[in-house]
């Protein structure tokens, strides 16, 4: 009986470890490269053909942006990392149809942390967000300090298109700063275009298998973001040419 109970405890522990590891996975469709590539192409088709009518370069970039945000939210136990900027308006609030390659993050209540604590928090946040990505060597652009982090990261491309307009394939810009308190903010449910496509086509099994479920992220209130955008436009209009 003792041996049986010990074996049962071992089995339970093993299942617990597997479950914990499972919870650490976030958006793994790219691990099945052929399926990932096929999904990108299918999702880019017209609505009449069952797709989303969005260019594959945007769908792919959105996948990696969404994955970075999902990873960030999972590790942000103290609710310090707040998603903001123009990309947040589109992804969280459905305002506009802007496609971007930047992920703008602000650290809330930074003044409650020591300089070293803040520096380590920004470093950890950047590391969490960019898991599986490669930092790009861009002298003169990359900027890191105790209050900020700004760098480009590359992701593996599954499509041939290199650029559409100002959007370049294969790269993301991650910006994290603690200069302004991001308030008010709220929890918003986000999902990738690919998740939307899989839902639309009845592929819930793939969403579950590859951890493509919607997730929650702290997002700066849209009124604050829109106000900041308006102020920025006014400053630009008043500036000397």
Predicted feature residues:
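N-terminal regions immediately upstream of nucleotidyltransferase
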Residues: 4-6, 10-67, 116
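Catalytic cores of NTP-dependent nucleotidyl/adenyl transfer enzymes across multiple folds
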Residues: 13, 20-26, 52, 66-70, ...
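Short, compositionally biased low-complexity segments
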Residues: 29-45, 95-106, 200-202
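Short, histidine-centered active-site or binding-site loop motifs used for metal coordination
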Residues: 44-47, 107-111, 234
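Generic non-transmembrane alpha-helical segments
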Residues: 68-77, 124-132
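Active-site nucleotide-donor binding segment shared across nucleotidyl transfer reactions
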Residues: 73-103, 107-109
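Short, conserved acidic/polar surface loops in the N-terminal third of protein domains
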Residues: 92-96, 115-120, 185-187
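Metal-dependent nucleotidyltransferase catalytic core
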Residues: 107-144
